[in-house]
Amino acid sequence: MKKKVIIGVVIALIVIAIILGIVFMVNKSPKTNLAPIEKAEDLSTLINEMYKGKEENLPRLNTQIVDVNDANAIKYSTGLENGNDLQFVAVSEPMMSSQAYSLILAKVKDGVDASNIAKTMSEQIDTRKWICVSAEKLYATSSGDIVCLVMSNEEWAKPVYDEFKKLAGQIGEEYTKTEELPELPEEL
């Protein structure tokens, strides 16, 4: 009788441990309504979804996959020193580089804090990387393992950023930056 009780207790403890393990794994996975990103091209597909219905209001854009192993391209595109924490990156920018607009989507590697990457990108990206123009507004956030950063003028950046938030459903902390315009001298 004593053996049966001990076996029953051991089995109950094993079942509880398994249930707790499953609950922990489910709660640890990133929460997002976005479709799983399995390859870099999936980021391009997401960008196209974000642009639906907004094409007439945006400049002519070109979406490219950025090689996460190319530190120079990563620095220019994201502001990050390297792509060590990134699995995939896609960038959408105008065909004419004198128009200040950039949308960056990045999938972070497993175990990397996407919100922290969004914050770092928002702090380090060059909002004046274009010829004679700069981004007036910058928005960045994350959803699950996807980072979104868009910078441009308010009229172009805000609707695209809002569409990402709508598609994602749940997002992490939001980071914004407004370009301070230089003060012009008074007319003589």
Regions found by a protein language model. Name each.
Residues K2-S102, V108-L188:
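Soluble, non-membrane globular domain cores that form compact, hydrophobic packing
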